[in-house]
Amino acid sequence: MASKDSDVRCVKCQSLKPTTPLTGQDRCARCVAINELKPWISTCNINPCYDGDLSESNETIEMMDINSCREDTPSDAESETRFMPFVAHSKQPKHTSKNPTKGEIQYFPVEKCKDIHRVENQSSIDEEGKQCWICRDGESLPEARYCNCYGDLQYCHEECLKTWISMSGEKKCKFCQTPYKVNRQLSLKRGLPGYWDRDDRFVFIAGFIGMGTILAGWIASFFYLLVVLCGKYFTYKDVMIVVGGLAIIQVVGLMFSLFMYFQIGNLLRQYINYMTETNIDPLRT
């Protein structure tokens, strides 16, 4: 028959455990240990009615505490997503409460401002005003518009546009691709371009003198041939003089043409462009 002490049950877990006679406790050693750790256990949300071995109770409590802390800790991916820098342009969702409870963390979606470049451009336009898109000068801008561009690209000086067309060779707007109404007219009122140096002027003038000399030789040979052929008497020597003269003029003219092409061809094109007056009719006003 079991002794009286062995029949005593723990008032907490009802296990057959003898009480401690010195202190008079009516709980087993396991329940006494749990009771001492009760404040710490309550913070970790651990069930105090653990049926495991007493020797493993402390380790089990520690493992449960670690697992509970891991559940409350956000993952790396969530932390990277949530803790993104807050942008001034981001908007707060409508479903979020205005007065969050204490300890509650609210995360707001980060939205990139799509119109930041447009806003900056618009502010610069408002500050600087109207400007020519070629020279960036806002003085004496004409009211005429030469293409279908709007905004800051519609303003342009006529002289700036003429220079741009002559230098680039384009005959339409590079933004809206609208063809310019360009009228070219050759004018002999201008002299040599002022941006030519002394060497350019000398080569250009010498080239025209050479062309005039060749043309004069052709004309003289032609009239001499007419005089010889129309005469009643002409010798073989007269015919050879005419043929030889024409051959020499032909060779000299060919060589001079090559010289003109390689030496003053660029100068001749510059002179033609300089002598040509370019007028651009406005597309709208």
Curated annotation (Swiss-Prot):
Regions of this protein lying in the Extracellular compartment: 223-238
EC number: 2.3.2.27
Keyword terms of this UniProt record: DNA-binding, Early protein, Membrane, Metal-binding, Transcription, Transcription regulation, Transferase, Transmembrane, Transmembrane helix, Ubl conjugation pathway, Zinc, Zinc-finger
Pathway noted in the entry: Protein modification; protein ubiquitination
A GO molecular-function annotation: DNA binding
Keyword Zinc among record annotations: yes
Cytoplasmic side: 1-201, 260-285
This protein's record includes keyword Zinc: yes
Gene Ontology CC terms: membrane
Zinc finger annotations (RING-CH-type) as residue ranges: 124-183
Transmembrane segment boundaries: 202-222, 239-259
Pfam families given in the database record: RINGv (PF12906)
Topology in the lipid bilayer: Multi-pass membrane protein
Class of the enzyme per the UniProt entry, highest EC level: transferase
PROSITE patterns in UniProt: ZF_RING_CH
Entry text on domains: The RING-CH-type zinc finger domain is required for E3 ligase activity.
Function in brief: Controls the expression of later classes of genes and also of the IE genes (Potential). E3 ubiquitin-protein ligase. E3 ubiquitin ligases accept ubiquitin from an E2 ubiquitin-conjugating enzyme in the form of a thioester and then directly transfer the ubiquitin to targeted substrates.
Protein name per its UniProtKB record: Probable E3 ubiquitin-protein ligase IE1
Organism annotation: Bovine herpesvirus 4 (strain DN-599)
Name of encoding gene: IE1
